[in-house]
From Swiss-Prot:
Predominant localisation class: membrane
Protein origin, superkingdom: Bacteria
Transmembrane segments: 22-42, 86-106, 120-140, 157-177, 205-225
Annotated protein name in UniProt: Uncharacterized protein MG452 homolog
Length: 251
């Protein structure tokens, strides 16, 4: 037992500061993962399907946080973490989760409308605690992990946009594809992911501009902000990252 404890202490001592911070927030990310799985099970039991849980950007982005944190702590030099692509993308995605729920959905009175304690706790963990924890840990990583390389901006943006574009396509077409379904209150309605602002079928004048603006304005600009923050904290000129055409831009 003492020998095992010694190995753990030695392993912990070798971790970089950012790895230690991410290690500290893994339990929080795991709790959020449990909430996601629990909601999937509850949906399957009560409704016979899980689509309303697995198609939420919130749930997907929170699972992404746990995967990244565990991977970075255990294998920071992994091929899949090279060029900061996973990290920078997850950082920008979780900002959208935080702002999308606490600003946009809150303004339309769709946020924190849960009446039971469990649902409210789930919302707080997934939309507030986990995003803030990842952003704090991420900034520590940006500031202290100097030995990193990342793709030039346009290539990095291209990889980053794959997920939003696929998700946006789903978001815009699911009202047509799934059609009408019976909601929790027993009414037959068009299936949408995030209320009327994403109802491209019945509310196209509002929904289509919202979807298009987020895909082609918000997401590129938000990633630019995250990318610029990384460059600033590493004291690297942002302008050079636009011109560099190699996989690894100069430090």
């Amino acid at each position: 037992m003492e020998q095992n404890n010694c190995k753990i202490r030695t392993w912990f001592a070798k971790l970089a500061l950012a790895q230690k911070v991410f290690l500290g927030v893994i339990p929080l990310f795991f709790i959020c993962f449990v909430f996601v799985i629990a909601d999937i099970v509850i949906s399957l039991q009560n409704k016979g399907h899980i689509i309303e849980e697995i198609d939420k950007f919130t749930n997907q982005s929170n699972v992404m946080l746990l995967i990244y944190a565990c991977w970075y702590v255990s294998k920071p030099k992994s091929h899949y973490l090279k060029n900061q692509q996973f990290f920078l993308s997850a950082f920008a995605y979780i900002i959208f989760t935080f702002l999308g729920y606490n600003v946009i959905l809150a303004a339309s009175q769709q946020a924190y409308s849960d009446k039971d304690a469990y649902s409210l706790a789930s919302s707080v963990f997934l939309h507030v605690l986990a995003p803030i924890a990842f952003l704090v840990a991420g900034i520590v990583k940006m500031k202290t992990d100097k030995d990193v390389t990342f793709n030039h901006f346009w290539k990095s943006l291209g990889y980053f946009m794959i997920y939003p574009l696929v998700y946006g396509l789903y978001l815009a077409t699911i009202p047509y594809v799934r059609g009408h379904y019976v909601s929790d209150d027993g009414k037959s309605t068009t299936y949408v992911v995030y209320g009327e602002i994403t109802n491209t079928k019945d509310n196209p004048i509002v929904a289509w501009p919202v979807v298009i603006c987020f895909l082609f304005i918000y997401f590129p600009l938000s990633f630019l902000a995250v990318y610029a923050l990384q460059c600033k904290l590493l004291n690297r000129p942002l302008k050079a990252q636009f011109k560099c055409a190699t996989n690894k831009c100069p430090k």
